[in-house]
């Protein structure tokens, strides 16, 4: 039953994305998909979260943190701040609740996109069928960036949990998942600024 559901799902997304997957390098195709997904998530956040209230909460919490830091050396003032700290904890809880609201609607589509990208760019996936010599590398990062992003650690971690499939060909190489995550963080940050999301 689930096999036929996923077949329909894959065929539907293939109809949408296969033209760019066949023509573009995997790095560019995944970047485009990450931009589309980030745009959808950020628009959902913009529509579902009261941005004015988020800004108010963040400002009040930040002001308290500055005050707390200044008065941390004075025990008398710290007692006074204890009461305010309770209120700030409630504001933090409200802020967290607001930030989780869009996740309720976007979590499932994100998981489905990961499943689709694995179907296309994973070991034995569609892209490897189209390009049999492909080794699974989507992009090679500059050495300094691979050190900053701890690529060696992620390769090691992946080797523990994922047996078989593509082999690690370089300490600077990223596969589809690493590249998608990197693109997603970058595009989401830019889109949040453009859309004025706090």
UniProtKB/Swiss-Prot annotation:
One of its GO terms (cellular component) is plasma membrane. GO terms for molecular function: small molecule binding. Its main location: membrane. It is a multi-pass membrane protein. The keyword Glycoprotein does not apply. It is found in: Cell membrane. This is Uncharacterized protein MJ0480. It comes from Methanocaldococcus jannaschii (strain ATCC 43067 / DSM 2661 / JAL-1 / JCM 10045 / NBRC 100440) (Methanococcus jannaschii). The lineage of its organism: Archaea, Methanobacteriati, Methanobacteriota, Methanomada group, Methanococci.
